[in-house]
Amino acid sequence: MGKLTGKTALITGALQGIGEGIARTFARHGANLILLDISPEIEKLADELCGRGHRCTAVVADVRDPASVAAAIKRAKEKEGRIDILVNNAGVCRLGSFLDMSDDDRDFHIDINIKGVWNVTKAVLPEMIARKDGRIVMMSSVTGDMVADPGETAYALTKAAIVGLTKSLAVEYAQSGIRVNAICPGYVRTPMAESIARQSNPEDPESVLTEMAKAIPMRRLADPLEVGELAAFLASDESSYLTGTQNVIDGGSTLPETVSVGI
């Protein structure tokens, strides 16, 4: 029996990248899945997982819109019955210098990376409180709260905010049986990382990914499935005494003082 057998997990931004990795990992550990994404293509992933014998429901919603989120969750619960686990994974990153970034681009990050998490959590949490049981996994980043790169001010702002939200919710709802923990990935080989590489060097994005890997002590980017395993641990009873934590999964990238000094 898998560590998530009998549990139903709602995963946002589940179509690709880390979200897809979490979905596939949770399915392997026995969870019933509700896959939420803004793209109707999420139906294809749900169909694939169902075809492999997993229980899976796809819902299309825009996390920026509370009404859209509420309607999607209502549809999902009509089929799945309840939500035991929430993974707030949906997020975006657009590069741009602080002075050149438009208010629209700033708000694009805030609306999805902060307000989207707020909206989904607010829609799911009351049911968890009523049952006095729930696990919430927040997708933050090493960027923002620990390190920063030029051109990622808006992204860093929002991911640091998720750490604060994680800790606040963990304290506020600990006695309601709710555990809230954050994952802080370094670079993961995802469409988002590839987009950052294209924005950094449109003519040779692969070289950017290569340089990313060189700066990591383990000399590679993470696989989304590796982040999925950490999320599964935080969503399972194996982490029953963990709440309000930041769980770094970065191959050691935040450890070196510099990449130019040493043996």
Curated annotation (Swiss-Prot):
Catalytic residues in the record: 155
CDD domains assigned to the protein according to its UniProt record, in alphabetical order: DHRS6_like_SDR_c
Recorded superkingdom: Bacteria
Cited InterPro entries: NAD(P)-bd_dom_sf, SDR_fam
Residues annotated for NAD(+) binding in this entry: 10-32
Residues where substrate binds: 141
Keyword Signal tagged: no
Enzyme class: oxidoreductase
A Pfam family recorded for this sequence: adh_short_C2
Keyword entries, A-Z: Oxidoreductase
EC number: 1.-.-.-
GO molecular function: diacetyl reductase ((S)-acetoin forming) (NAD+) activity
Family: Belongs to the short-chain dehydrogenases/reductases (SDR) family.
PANTHER family for this protein: 3-OXOACYL-[ACYL-CARRIER-PROTEIN] REDUCTASE, SHORT-CHAIN DEHYDROGENASES/REDUCTASES FAMILY MEMBER
NCBIfam families in UniProt: PRK07231.1, PRK08226.1
Listed name of the protein: Oxidoreductase UcpA
